[in-house]
From Swiss-Prot:
Its EC number is 2.3.1.274. Keywords: Cytoplasm, Lipid biosynthesis, Lipid metabolism, Phospholipid biosynthesis, Phospholipid metabolism, Transferase. This is Phosphate acyltransferase. GO terms for molecular function: phosphate:acyl-[acyl carrier protein] acyltransferase activity. It catalyses: a fatty acyl-[ACP] + phosphate = an acyl phosphate + holo-[ACP]. It comes from Synechocystis sp. (strain ATCC 27184 / PCC 6803 / Kazusa). The gene is plsX. GO terms for biological process: fatty acid biosynthetic process; phospholipid biosynthetic process. HAMAP family: PlsX. The lineage of its organism: Bacteria, Bacillati, Cyanobacteriota, Cyanophyceae, Synechococcales. Homodimer. Probably interacts with PlsY.
Length: 348
């Protein structure tokens, strides 16, 4: 892994708590991570936030932008707002002034801006949003993609998702031989709809993908898989359900544990354990999701992100930069394209 001083273009105006929480997260990241940060947005609003929080001796640069794509607006608005913060941030990456974009704003707008400004990697038909899920194995995560970028998919899209997930698992998560699974309603190869059946065949025949078979819903958090692929419709439902389960679990613990003096004593004794539980199940700990398949690093954070989540999103972006995820995916998909061309020539 080549560790570099990463330059992050941070959409300071994106999110429910922008710019305050975004700026606080940026300050912490600048202090604790080896990064330089461009705060993109309304200069006066950003400066007001900086004045309220100590930030001496750290490298934060404000880049002017005009306006923001609001959550209720359609993603295509990015075309009509070229000076919006998300577009300006993407341009910094396009012009090689920054290495990655991080945004907690409109996720559809972030994806649209990435496609417009950065473009797709060769061999990628559709970008995918990939996010890390905790598993029952301590310290192990599983990357699931797509979790919302493409509600309708072709088998070849899922094959590309599997390649991108494999690269991430190998070079960022450090898994030598990742186990790739296809999310389905059963383990058997003859289970599922047309998309699942055709995708299973593609994944099984691709030597670049360490495919081990179908993964059922219960397998997502089991730790038996390192990469799980699905279409964005199913993936987004899985993501939102998992987030809700995590929130409910934490809520139940907070509600039940302090009851009575024994509970209060137990809460004090178990405080370190409870903190670790929160770190494993709280989606804010991962910071966001990577947009795979675009020509650059892009992290999309939850709209409700607070400063801690923004910090983690910046860390996620830096890991992708240090491990050259985009470059490695490009190499992997180039091999896929060459194999497909060879097969086409053989079939003539």
């Amino acid at each position: 892994m080549a560790v570099t001083r990463a330059k992050i273009a941070l959409d300071a105006m994106g999110g429910d708590y922008a710019p305050e929480e975004i700026v606080i997260g940026a300050i912490r990241a600048s202090q604790e991570l080896d990064v330089d940060i461009f705060l993109v947005g309304d200069r006066q609003a950003i400066e007001d936030c900086l004045n309220r929080h100590p930030h001496q001796g750290i490298n934060l640069t404000i880049v002017d932008a005009e306006g923001v794509v609001e959550m209720e607006e359609d993603a295509v608005v990015v075309r009509r707002k070229p000076k919006a913060s998300i577009n300006v941030a993407m341009n910094l990456v396009k012009e090689k002034q920054a290495d990655a974009v991080v945004s907690a704003g409109h996720s559809g707008a972030a994806m649209a801006a990435a496609l417009l400004r950065l473009g797709r990697l060769k061999g990628i038909d559709r970008p995918a949003i990939g996010t890390l899920f905790p598993t029952m194995v301590p310290g192990k995560s599983v990357i699931v993609l797509d979790v919302g970028a493409n509600v309708d998919c072709k088998p070849k899209y899922l094959e590309q998702f599997a390649l991108m997930g494999t690269v991430y698992s190998q070079y960022v998560l450090g898994v030598d031989s990742p186990k790739v699974g296809l999310l389905n309603i059963g383990e058997e190869s003859n289970k599922g709809n047309t998309l699942a059946l055709q995708t299973h065949e593609l994944l099984q025949s691709n030597p670049e993908i360490p495919f081990v078979g179908n993964a059922e819903g219960r397998d997502v958090l089991s730790g038996n898989f390192d990469v799980i692929v699905c279409d964005g419709f199913v993936g987004n439902i899985v993501l939102k359900f998992a987030e809700a389960v995590g929130e409910i679990l934490l809520s139940i613990v907070k509600e039940e544990l302090p009851r009575g003096w024994r509970g209060k004593l137990g809460a004090i004794i178990l405080a370190p354990n409870l903190k670790r539980i929160k770190q494993r199940v709280d989606h804010a700990e991962h910071g966001g999701a990577l947009l795979f398949g675009v020509d650059g690093v892009c992290v999309i954070s939850h709209g409700s992100s607070r400063s801690g989540s923004i910090f983690n999103a910046i860390r996620l972006a830096k890991e992708a930069i240090d491990n050259q995820v985009s470059v490695r995916i490009n190499s992997s998909t180039s091999l896929l394209m060459e194999r497909q061309k060879t097969e086409e020539l053989q079939n003539i």
